[in-house]
Amino acid sequence: TDTLLYDFKKRYDLVVGNPPFSKLKAKDAKKYLENNINKNTTNTFEFFLEKALAISDYVSMIMPKAILNTPEFSDTREILSHKKIDCIQDYGENGFKGVLVETICMFIDTVGIPNETKVESLTLKQSVIQKQKYITDMKYPYWIIYRDKFFDNISQRLEFDKFTVFRDRQITNSNTTQEKKADCLRVIKSRNISDDGKEIVDIPGYDSYIKKETVEALSAYKYVGNQNVYLTPNMTYKPRVMRNTKNVVVNGSVAVLIPKEDIHLTEKQMEYFSSDEYRKFYQIARNYQTRSLNVDATSVFFYGVLKECCNG
């Protein structure tokens, strides 16, 4: 019997689960999505979670940490925010030995009224009692489970949601070369952006180039020479931002930040992204994740521009 499709005739006191985390093909997911609230996922764990919430008064379930922040699970977060979440245990990458997936366990009272949530981190070795509405605050694009006064103070100094993001998926080792030629553009990779974001660093054996005629057919080409966009390394807790420069193109290890409005960052505003203060803030904003650190459509929200009044 397929548990996900089975029509349970009675309600249960408790469901405990460690469901499979696997993405199904659209045609295989179709039968499960019919009765699912979240129509934007094909991940089996989410189907099991929704099923458990529907048939039980209490649910304790292991799930990927990505549920906290990825766009795919925004509808799931909306469902959960109305349940009473007693505890979120964050295992980081230590949940399953040898499995490079970050996991959490959520303890959910499906009939209770949201109040306080205990957030426990096995990797940070810390435990804190949070107001559930504080960590699931709708003014942010996803849950911030380690939110604190420091985070709130920095938030007051920043203007959020100023950029959209582009990340290349076409420039690879197969269409680039380490040989610099006249008909080539420099490919900027994450390590080429200095720690303070002020210069492009040459790294022998790492630097690469791509033929102009090759890159002209790629999506990233539209940003070549556009000095109104900004570059930031992807997958790092050492963010830094630099203005795009001429005759370069970026690969997927660097995200292109595209201003939503006609804004031009000052030197101080760009410098702030590589400050210790902002980097500490950014770790909290990313829930101390170690795997899913892409600068994506939701996390780019937190590339906040320092307010001019705070530039001193």
Task: Give the ranges of each region predicted by the language model.
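Polybasic, glycine- and aromatic-enriched phosphate-binding surface used to engage nucleic acids
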Residues: 149-312
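Signature of N6-adenine DNA methyltransferases within the class I
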Residues: 1-162
